[in-house]
């Protein structure tokens, strides 16, 4: 049964896969930081190469954000692809078992029926997930068009990565707000001053009335 795409706010499916060097990578390894997980159909094809190179060129700008590619290709295929285009981020091999389907691609809903020249077949639909530090999907791009995609993902990743710092910057404001009541005594002092001035006027008026009565007598 084909799994559906993962919606925003939903926990991303856990995975454990080897990268181009044979190192095992798991979703849990990226906990605590944003993760760009992009699925692509095949190594060293035109659109897939353009997409990989675009992420590679922008990689230094993904500060605090991990970028990982996944396709059904083998570790050996990934190694050649990464070496040819000098890709320094992980490419995970979701190689399907004989007669089976790629497990992680299926879990993320990107293993779908496709059509080319009137023929239908199963394959990876180009999809990108932005996963938050808590492991939930923050954003998803479906049926990705390569041109400008890496830049769009970078902008969204920066916004997500800045979320924690924005929260921490808001805390001092809340603390300073707690000191706001200190202004109240000043207002009270002014009110007291008004009362005193009013009472002094009343006293003066009463003295004037007394003097007038005395003069009449």
Model-derived segments and spans:
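Chalcogenol-based redox active-site neighborhoods
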Residues: 1-217
């Amino acid at each position: 049964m084909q799994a559906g795409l993962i919606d925003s706010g939903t926990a991303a499916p856990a995975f454990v896969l080897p990268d181009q060097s044979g190192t095992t990578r798991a979703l849990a390894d990226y906990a605590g930081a944003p993760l760009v997980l992009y699925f692509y159909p095949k190594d060293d094809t035109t659109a897939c190469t353009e997409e990989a190179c675009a992420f590679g060129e922008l990689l230094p700008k993904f500060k605090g954000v991990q970028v990982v590619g996944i396709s059904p290709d083998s570790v050996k295929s990934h190694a050649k692809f990464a070496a040819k285009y000098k890709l320094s981020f992980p490419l995970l091999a979701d190689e399907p078992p004989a007669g089976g389907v790629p497990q992680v691609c299926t879990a993320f809903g990107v293993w779908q029926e496709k059509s080319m020249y009137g023929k239908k077949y199963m394959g990876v639909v180009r999809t990108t997930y932005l996963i938050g530090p808590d492991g939930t999907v923050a954003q998803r791009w479906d049926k990705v068009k390569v041109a400008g995609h890496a830049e769009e993902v970078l902008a969204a990743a920066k916004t997500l990565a800045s979320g924690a710092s924005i929260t921490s910057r808001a805390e001092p404001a809340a603390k300073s707000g707690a000191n706001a009541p200190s202004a109240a005594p000043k207002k009270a002092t002014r009110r007291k001053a008004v009362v005193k001035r009013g009472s002094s006027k009343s006293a003066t008026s009463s003295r004037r009335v007394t003097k007038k009565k005395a003069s009449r007598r």
